[in-house]
From Swiss-Prot:
The lineage of its organism: Bacteria, Bacillati, Mycoplasmatota, Mycoplasmoidales, Metamycoplasmataceae. It is an enzyme of class 6 (ligase). This is Glutamate--tRNA ligase. It is found in: Cytoplasm. Its EC number is 6.1.1.17.
Length: 466
């Protein structure tokens, strides 16, 4: 069997989107499961939409997730040519010339306004969808020569008639299209750049891509690409078209929807655990046979079976992603967690750091959340919290019961306060937490108090002396 080779081929038009990250991840898992190669290449021929730094952003965010390509523009294998489309224009022109020589493609002189007029006529005749008619435009050879000089032309493929293009989709099973449903389409634009459907075929062939996993919006592109493979007498890869990702209401994710953070960069900046997102994305349209959810990268690679890719849309549940991050945070070593935190010039002994980390990582979702908790100890805030009469009674009792300043003695004082005042739950803990930490929520109370240090807690409790 030939080596499995998959690819993720984004355009450098912005940050790595959740949808793109999932596609890259599935391609990566597929390749690694079969001991193959995962390739990153760049579709950068749409110059107007390219964003400076877009390529670096894509690669950096993939690396942060743990998706490392075997080949990329930064790690090329010269055997497979260039990894940026903008560097392959001569190669595309070479393939275009092959098609022109065989009369499988032709030059089309339609101006944009002429195409619009043809579409309008098609609508008026009652056709459901527009199909380009190469015989519609009637212009003289003189006009053609003029348009040649002004680069007012494109190249179109001559689609075959009465041919069925079909493939066994890795996700959806058998899919077929009649060539009669597809009009001659543009393969080279007037700016001398190839179109997506043309360039992607050349790239996949040159890089010997064996399997393509991509979004379902590309289903309609596949028969066009298969036509090119036929004309060029090349073997096509196997295709699989992933279902859409929706929000929790079932609406397809849109980059224009600013109410939902949809870019990996957002979650990276918030301090999510990278592998938590890796794990979460792997289950966004795929399940393991044993229905296990929390899995290492090694497990996911081992268990990845493309036959278990979902045929139904997947919901992007931020709460579920946070759940994964919380689990991975909890299971990380204190040393690993501390490496992501800025203790500034804090010179306390290592046991303080250990207690802080052990206490707060139990309930934290992100490193940013942990850093905010740490900052509260490094730069203690003043309080505007007001205690009522019942709460004051609890705090005074706690203060009277606190004999020495250790975690164990603080807990003993809390327990004795509960016993003496016959209190439990919020009525017991909230007044003590507010008086000592100036917060209404937090982790295990005795440790949260201890971490502020005896001097500061003594000062805070002194406010509540008789």
């Amino acid at each position: 069997m030939n080596k499995i080779r998959t690819r993720y081929a984004p355009s450098p038009t912005g940050f790595l989107h959740i949808g793109g990250a999932r596609t890259a991840l599935f391609c990566y898992l597929f390749a690694k499961h079969f001991n193959g190669d995962f390739i990153f290449r760049l579709e950068d021929t749409d110059v107007k939409r390219n964003v400076e730094g877009g390529e670096a952003s894509q690669l950096e965010n993939l690396a942060w997730l743990g998706i490392i390509p075997d080949e990329s523009p930064l790690k090329p294998n010269l055997k497979y040519g260039k990894y940026r489309q903008s560097e392959k224009l001569d190669r595309y022109k070479e393939v275009l010339d092959m098609l022109l020589e065989k009369n499988l493609a032709y030059k089309a002189y339609d101006l944009p306004e002429e195409l619009e007029a043809q579409k309008l006529e098609s609508e008026q005749k009652g056709f459901a969808s527009f199909r380009y008619d190469p015989s519609w435009l009637k212009i003289s050879d003189e006009e053609k020569a003029k348009r040649d000089l002004n680069n007012q032309f494109s190249y179109r493929i001559r689609m075959p008639k009465d041919k069925v293009f079909s493939w066994n989709d890795l996700v959806r099973g058998e899919i077929s299209f009649s060539s009669n449903e597809i009009s001659d389409w543009v393969i080279f634009k007037s700016d001398n750049y190839p179109t997506y459907n043309f360039a992607v075929v050349v790239d996949d062939h040159d890089m010997q891509i064996s399997h393509v996993l991509r979004g379902e919006e590309h289903i309609g592109n596949t028969p066009k690409q298969l036509a090119l493979y036929d004309y060029l007498n090349w073997s096509s890869p196997q295709y699989g078209h992933l279902t859409i990702i929706t929000d929790m209401g079932g609406k397809k994710l849109s980059k224009r929807d600013l109410s939902l953070k949809q870019f990996i960069e957002d979650y990276k900046n918030e301090g999510y655990i990278p592998h938590a997102i890796f794990n979460f994305l792997a289950l966004l349209g795929w399940t393991s046979e044993d229905a296990k959810e929390v899995m290492s990268k090694k497990e996911l690679i081992s268990k990845f079976n493309p036959a278990r890719l979902s045929k139904s849309p997947s919901k992007f549940d931020v709460n579920k992603m946070s759940w994964f991050s919380k689990i991975y945070m909890k299971n990380q070593s204190n040393e690993e967690v501390q490496s992501h935190l800025d203790f500034k010039d804090f010179n306390s002994n290592s046991s303080w750091k250990e207690i802080f980390t052990s206490t707060f990582k139990e309930s934290a979702t992100t490193y940013l959340e942990l850093q905010k908790a740490l900052n509260n100890y490094l730069n203690p805030m003043s309080s505007e919290l007001v205690l009522n009469e019942e709460e004051l009674k609890v705090v005074k009792e706690f203060k009277a019961n606190l004999k020495s300043f250790t975690v164990e003695e603080i807990q003993a004082a809390i327990n004795l306060t509960a016993s003496n005042l016959k209190l439990k739950g919020k009525a017991l803990f909230m007044p003590i937490r507010k008086a000592c930490t100036y917060l209404e929520h937090g982790p295990e109370l005795a440790k949260a108090i201890y971490l502020f240090g005896e001097k500061l807690i003594t000062e805070r409790l002194a406010k509540y002396e008789n």
